[in-house]
Regions:
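Extended, charged helical/alpha-beta scaffold domains that provide interaction surfaces
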Residues: 1-96
Length: 96
């Protein structure tokens, strides 16, 4: 399980214990969730990084790529990893 899966598992343990108890194989669930999050972050960061301005220098490029990664990670963390305990629709979607 990667760090995204471990972070999600801890979040569910703290904020969604009843829902966590319904998962037959938490290890497999959070392993897959972590892998999905990592893939989604990479894809979103890559898409965001495509917006390259002309005459960009090395430092500007590094800042753009770092910002793209951070934005993608923030979005995915909110959607998949640190799901709002009050958002029953998102929780149901994650549980399948």
């Amino acid at each position: 399980m990667n760090h995204y899966g471990a972070r999600a598992q801890e979040h569910w343990r703290t904020h969604l214990p009843r829902q966590l108890a319904t998962i037959p194989d938490p290890e497999a669930f959070f392993t897959l969730l972590g892998e999905t999050a990592e893939t989604e972050i990479e894809q979103r960061a890559e898409a965001l990084a495509q917006l390259k301005p002309p005459a960009e220098g090395y430092l500007e490029e590094m800042a753009r790529l770092t910002t793209a990664r951070q934005l993608a990670e923030m979005e995915v963390m909110r959607e998949l990893i640190l799901v709002d305990p009050d958002n029953q629709q998102a929780i149901s979607q994650l549980l399948g």
